[in-house]
Amino acid sequence: MAKSTKMEEEKYMRRCIELAKNGLCNVSPNPMVGAVIVCDGRIIGEGYHIRCGEAHAEVNAIRSVKDESLLKRSTIYVSLEPCSHYGKTPPCADLIIEKQIPRIVIGCQDPFSEVAGRGIQKLRDAGREVRVGVLEEECKSLIRRFITFNTLHRPFITLKWAESADHFIDIERTDGKPVVLSSPLTSMLVHKKRAEADAIMVGRRTALLDNPSLTVRNWYGHNPIRVVLDRTLSLPNDSQIFDGNVPTLIFTEKQQPEKKNITYITINFNHNPLKQIMEALYQRKIQSLLVEGGRQLLQSFIDNELWDEAYIEKCPSRLHSGVKAPQMDDNFSYSIEEHFERQIWHYVRRL
């Protein structure tokens, strides 16, 4: 079996990353993983983790190989360390050993405590050649949600809002519809982000004034769990969040029995409520959270340094007065993405 070059290893690992991204909306709370099997410089099998509870990437890649006799002289590339424990599926490291694949190239080590190097060691103990760290940062970035959830014990948090050219997110109002700052096309991107999240959060004022459904409509995908803060349970019973169509968590100070698809969680709003909320979401295995507003809620996440990325749509129109946009710290770097003649500023915090 010929040694692969650094360029070849990175080429195949990039393919692993491409494959893994196909599982974005379906694998949580598992990580996205892709795998490629190469023999004599040619890809003979590939796969990715499609859905939580189903076969892992390595299994799907091995199943895709038409001539299994080639496995004995192949290299399997995988973006994340193969698992070594029994979960909902058998250990992938055991399957790789069973199929006598002699060489394994891994993007990054698994941060999950039940794996965390054990898969790598099991492969090496079985006499396999194992290389770790090919495109490591890219592979870690791929599973930022999984890493955050398993190391910080909270969801990966994405903040999102649209603001006018003069930095307002809405007019001052006590009723009526909000000012629409997003274009129909950038609104599709918002629904894409919703489909990619496990849960979506708004505060009481946004739920009251906007009466949002917080569902995915302009994109294909599942509806995220709705998370609403309503300290005194003052929201009207006919609000869309109470329609029972989507699992909904209401954080409040008052005791309230569960209704259809609606769970009330009691917390102390006078003692670090965001910390209590994150603990509750972690216990429910919610790996990613999209925070859509309003201003006070978004700013509280920023002030508590409780966020991982933020998407800010910059709109060309001016409002001249109204509700000021949240303020980001100037110390954080950002990239500017152009979407449909709009700028979207993307802030990312380091792992």
Identify what each model region corresponds to.
Residues I143-H153:
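Flexible, polar/acidic helix-loop-strand segments at domain edges
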Residues A2-P31, E46, K66, L70, ...:
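Enzymes that bind and transform nitrogen-containing heteroaromatic metabolites
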Residues F112-S113, E138-K140, L209, L297-L298:
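Short secondary-structure capping/turn micro-motifs that flank functional sites
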